[in-house]
Amino acid sequence: RLPDFFSKKIEAPVYPFESPNFLPSAQNKQVNLVKSVAYNVFRLHKYMSSVRYINRMIKETGADVVINFYELLTGLTYLFCRPKAVMVCIAHQYLFLHPDFTFPKENRLSLASLKFFTRITAIGAAKKLALSFRKMREVPADGIVVVPPLLRKEVLEMTPTKGDYLHGYLLNSGFGEEICSWHKVHPSIELHIFWDKKEVLPEVKVDSRLSFHQLNDTLFVRYMAGARAYATTAGFESV
């Protein structure tokens, strides 16, 4: 689902479409690759309909520029339909394509797959804006420009305070088990953890020192402003 702040502040029509997804494991701690591939292959006909829909909406709206936030189907739209509108891609993942970016020593197949997926999202792009806190040179031949992430006005207007708690974000809610285990060893430390766990209350209060919160941009920023430290399993934008 779309974040509330996006829906409220975009001030433009929003047209949803179905897109491929990675499905989590039963414990919701990592991607289930086999399950994800099978699920997405079964829904290929829907994704092709989405590609046609994206192409149609680009034409009907008379878009001058298409801004793509790491969406696979937008890249495929430019591969198969060749829209005339200029496309600009924005994501921290485009830093993976920068020749000066150093990867940790990981499985070569996994890294090759990640780069391949990233390139598909940017098929036909005039520019790839790679988000990074570190300055790096442009790569004109590949259309890569490294830019810092933008901060929302609400973040800049927030006044920092000295809170006595740790703040965190879990991309996969299954890691809540690890948080609870750590909390048992360190019960005196107050924790406010955000997640996107379905079918739970906005706040799950384990005890007086540990709370899990559903994603809420206003509350998230408020807790971040007073945290002693911040920990996250993912979410470059929050960092």
PLM features per residue range, with description:
Residues 1-4, 70-73, 131-136, 193-202:
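Short, polar loop motifs at secondary-structure junctions
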Residues 1-45:
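Conserved nucleotide-sugar phosphate-binding/catalytic loop shared by glycosyltransferases and other
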Residues 30-65, 73:
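Conserved nucleotide-sugar donor-binding subdomain of glycosyltransferases
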Residues 66-81:
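An aromatic- and histidine-rich active-site surface loop
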Residues 66-69, 219-239:
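A donor-sugar binding/catalytic signature common to diverse glycosyltransferases
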Residues 81-146:
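Active-site-proximal region of nucleotide-activated glycan assembly enzymes
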Residues 139-141, 145-146, 150-163:
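Acidic anion/phosphate-binding donor-loop and adjacent secondary structure
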Residues 152, 159-226:
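Donor-nucleotide binding loops and adjacent catalytic segments primarily
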